[in-house]
């Protein structure tokens, strides 16, 4: 057999002759089985169409089930029918060609000119050739008289899905598929080509079917259901319908039945052939099973998420995988995954026996499939597979093991596996972890690794895949392990880092008021898997105390320097240099934390140019992993010992504070009333480019926004800096000052589509307000807080604002998913070459430099090639 290189694939339309040639039999009978249950010859289950039973031989090719590819049959249609997939093309042909002579409705000179141009450009510039054919079609469709035979043209109408009508002088006439085929047969090959079709593979009359191909049985096998009844495939049901109606139509024509009956049967045949190709045609009732379920026909097999392309080619089901709920575990390493023992006993890794591992593997074989760590199978050098469930004496089998055997052993601690959470929106939605077999039934995941997976623990499930070859394991270790992906390729910052309790703990530990006795320091350092020397206590008398800053400094490299603002540096605690009384400017010199606190800006996830980022960048991702596995555990331990909780009193304000807020509310109400009065009196000054109504809305919104922020500032001013709700908001651990404002002071304006709520009843939002009322309360402003509780009208407006968020999320998800899929398909063949260019599969240059600057964000300094300031600081320090 000679080898050939595939240059390309060309799609065309099957001609009636080709359909007959590739067919092994004509399908003529609607009955499928005889009384004995044997398939009838000439039926849609004719044995010559392929083998679906094990052990049988195909009468056509002589092969058995595994090797018989299946063979086509054909149905000779009594009357032609339109192929529903080509209706648009048929419509174009009918409008662009003459009804009498079949020529394209442009002059001979133009045909010659356009043909010459088309043939010159079609190979080199296919898109230009397509534009030319579109122009020819549009020009030809406009012609009212044929330039070749002088015939006057009538208007053609398409009534979807497949009925064509011609508006003649005497009235509207329906064009039957026979009429259409007759017209299309007249179109010469040169004219077919100028309309953008290849006449050798796609003649227009082939779009009107006279012969229907019957697919092999192998793609529509019948299945035996529990009761022993044979259930046929949906395609088989559809083909039986087509054969039955075709036979009835033939009998009616032969018997000389009235034209009305023949036309009804012809329409029915057209319907069955159309729904055979696509059972979701708009305007056509779907063909249904006896149970009422719509049949899954050819188009449904191909399109959509479960279809052939996305369901079986782009994505496949795999072996050696498992799925269960995930639970948090801060005590395992960031690149470990806790695997339930039941899963570890089910999933296996093939390990080849060598002189160095033979004793270990013998013990695994003796343990067998039910005791972990054991083994499920042994594969002998001759390829024979031994299932250990059925081996009586496993010790004897273990003694016969020798180098060359392969043992499919259970997952054990340290094995490399792939972990994934759907939807997999970016590369690091799938990373490699090392196995830690644990009790329980859920996968355990370190909390720090949630952001790349976008995981939380409210019932999320994740998938685990076990690589089966040494190459796959090596690749996973080298490029997919979690700590090698701490820096995200999206923006060159750490996507894995502290969140929530970690940040709260870090802040409480590093704040300057935190002092620890030696015993307390030892207790929190006990969770770190490393020896720590704290040095001399910071306070010696009246009692020895270590500061929280000393504890953190013990984990930092001795040559590390950093300075920058903390997250708490805002509002009254804002500091822009080292002279900071509020502990909100971070200074680290020679690995010692001298000033400032650790919060979100220092160690938080998705925080580029943070302390964590520079530590990983300058001291390796291995060091980053070590830091997260040790120092971050200390933060959690500290917050556990310290206690960290929130109570109702944390968001309760005193009477004097409430009075201050109510005064602000009254002032804002007066201001809004004045604006409305000015508007009614015609004294309001419009904003340039806005109508008077829009200007009023803007002025009111500005006033109400100021009111909410003022109320928030008043509440914040009176909150204790160690109020835990406030600590969470200021450090960036969870929530924001706005959330506290809404809980303690007021909710503020509820908006829908960025505007105050307007819609509701005819002249008002709710029946609780007067018609044409545009006051803040009537348009969705909520003066209450969550602490005091919402009034009924306020609750309604709040629900309207919340509903918009839900709808928006659902719409955005589907749109972004579809957009991403299109981008992936378009960009999947591009790659960055060694010369720095980005090229397509054919070597075409897409970008002269990758990303126009040749910088890969993952290895950059937050997208910059080099951070010069940081390098200077490392070499010469910074000016104080």
UniProtKB/Swiss-Prot annotation:
EC number annotated for this UniProt entry: 2.7.7.6
Residue positions binding Zn(2+) 3: 573, 575, 580, 582
Compartments it resides in: Cytoplasm
Top-level division of the source organism's lineage: Archaea
Binding site for Zn(2+) 2: 98, 101, 146, 149
CDD domains hit by this protein: RNAP_archeal_A
NCBIfam families: PRK08566.1, RNA_pol_rpoA1
Protein name, as recorded: DNA-directed RNA polymerase subunit Rpo1N
């Amino acid at each position: 057999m000679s080898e050939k290189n595939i240059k390309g694939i060309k799609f065309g339309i099957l001609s009636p002759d080709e359909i007959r040639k590739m067919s092994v039999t004509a399908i003529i009978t609607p009955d499928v089985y005889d009384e004995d249950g044997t398939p009838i010859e000439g039926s849609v289950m004719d044995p010559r169409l392929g083998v679906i039973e094990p052990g049988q031989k195909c009468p056509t090719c002589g092969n058995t089930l595994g090797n018989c590819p299946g063979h086509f049959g054909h149905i000779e249609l009594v009357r032609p029918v339109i192929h529903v997939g080509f209706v648009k093309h048929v419509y174009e042909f009918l409008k662009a060609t003459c009804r009498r002579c079949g020529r394209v409705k442009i002059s001979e000179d133009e045909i010659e000119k356009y043909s010459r141009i088309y043939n010159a450009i079609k190979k080199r510039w296919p898109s230009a050739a397509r534009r030319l054919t579109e122009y020819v079609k549009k020009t030809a469709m406009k012609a009212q008289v044929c330039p070749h035979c002088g015939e006057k043209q009538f208007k053609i109408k398409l009534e979807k899905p497949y009925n064509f009508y011609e508006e003649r002088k005497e009235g509207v006439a329906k064009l039957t598929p026979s009429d259409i085929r007759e017209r299309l047969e007249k179109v010469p090959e040169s004219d077919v080509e100028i309309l953008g079709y290849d006449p050798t593979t796609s003649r227009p009359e082939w779009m009107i079917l006279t012969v229907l191909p019957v697919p092999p049985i192998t793609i529509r096998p019948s299945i035996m259901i529990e009761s022993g009844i044979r259930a046929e495939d949906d395609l088989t049901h559809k083909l039986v319908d087509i054969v039955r109606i075709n036979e009835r139509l033939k009998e009616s024509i032969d018997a000389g039945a009235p034209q009305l009956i023949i036309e009804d049967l012809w329409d029915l045949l057209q319907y069955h052939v159309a729904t055979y190709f696509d059972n979701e045609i708009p305007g056509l009732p779907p063909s249904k099973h006896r149970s009422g379920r719509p049949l899954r026909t050819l188009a449904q097999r191909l399109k959509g998420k479960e279809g052939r392309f996305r369901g079986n080619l782009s994505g496949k089901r795999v072996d050696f995988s498992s799925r269960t709920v995930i639970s948090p575990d801060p005590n395992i390493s960031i690149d470990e995954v806790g695997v339930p023992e039941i899963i570890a006993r089910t999933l296996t890794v093939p390990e080849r026996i060598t002189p160095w591992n033979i004793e270990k593997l013998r013990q695994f074989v003796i343990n067998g499939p039910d005791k972990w760590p054991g083994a499920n199978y042994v594969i002998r050098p001759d390829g024979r597979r031994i299932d250990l469930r059925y081996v009586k004496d496993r010790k004897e089998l273990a003694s016969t093991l020798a180098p060359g055997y392969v043992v499919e052993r259970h997952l054990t601690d340290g094995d490399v596996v792939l972990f994934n959470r759907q939807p997999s929106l970016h590369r690091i939605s799938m990373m490699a972890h090392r196995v830690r077999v644990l009790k329980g039934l859920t996968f355990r995941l370190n909390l720090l690794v949630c952001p790349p997976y976008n995981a939380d623990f409210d019932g999320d499930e994740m998938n685990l895949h076990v690589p089966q070859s040494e190459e796959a394991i090596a690749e996973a270790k080298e490029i997919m392990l979690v700590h090698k992906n701490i820096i995200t390729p999206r923006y060159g910052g750490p996507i894995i880092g502290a969140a929530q309790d970690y940040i709260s703990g870090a802040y409480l530990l590093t704040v300057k008021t935190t002092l620890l006795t030696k015993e307390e320091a030892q207790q929190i350092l006990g969770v770190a898997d490393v020896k720590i020397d704290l040095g001399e206590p910071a306070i010696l008398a009246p009692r020895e105390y270590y500061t929280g800053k000393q504890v953190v400094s013990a984990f930092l490299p001795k040559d590390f320097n950093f300075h920058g603002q903390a997250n708490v540096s805002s509002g009254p605690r804002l500091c822009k240099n080292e002279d900071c009384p509020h502990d909100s400017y971070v200074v680290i010199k020679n690995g010692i934390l001298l000033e400032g606190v650790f919060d979100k800006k220092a160690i938080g996830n998705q925080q580029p140019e943070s302390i964590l980022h520079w530590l990983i960048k300058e001291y390796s991702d291995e060091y980053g992993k070590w830091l997260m596995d040790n120092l971050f555990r200390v933060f959690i331990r500290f917050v556990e010992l310290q206690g960290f909780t929130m109570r109702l009193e944390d968001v309760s304000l005193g009477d004097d504070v409430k009075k201050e807020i109510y005064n602000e509310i009254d002032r804002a109400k007066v201001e809004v009333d004045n604006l409305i009065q000015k508007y009614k009196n015609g004294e309001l000054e419009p904003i340039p480019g806005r109508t008077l109504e829009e200007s009023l809305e803007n002025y009111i919104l500005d006033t109400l926004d100021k009111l909410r922020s003022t109320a928030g500032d008043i509440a914040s001013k009176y909150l204790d800096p160690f109020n835990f709700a406030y600590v969470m908001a200021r450090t960036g651990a969870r929530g924001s000052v706005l959330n506290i404002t809404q809980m303690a002071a007021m909710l503020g304006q509820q908006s829908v589509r960025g505007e105050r709520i307007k819609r509701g009843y005819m002249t008002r939002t709710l029946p609780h307000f007067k018609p044409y009322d545009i006051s803040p309360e009537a348009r969705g402003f909520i003066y209450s807080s969550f602490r005091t509780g919402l009034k009924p009208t306020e609750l309604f407006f709040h629900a309207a604002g919340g509903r918009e968020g839900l709808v928006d999320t659902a719409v955005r998800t589907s749109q972004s998913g579809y957009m991403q899929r299109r981008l992936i398909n378009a960009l999947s063949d591009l790659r960055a070459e060694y010369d720095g260019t980005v090229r397509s599969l054919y070597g075409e240059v897409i970008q002269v430099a990758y990303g126009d600057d040749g910088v890969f964000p993952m290895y950059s300094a937050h997208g910059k090639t080099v951070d010069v300031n940081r390098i200077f600081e490392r070499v010469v320090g910074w000016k104080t």
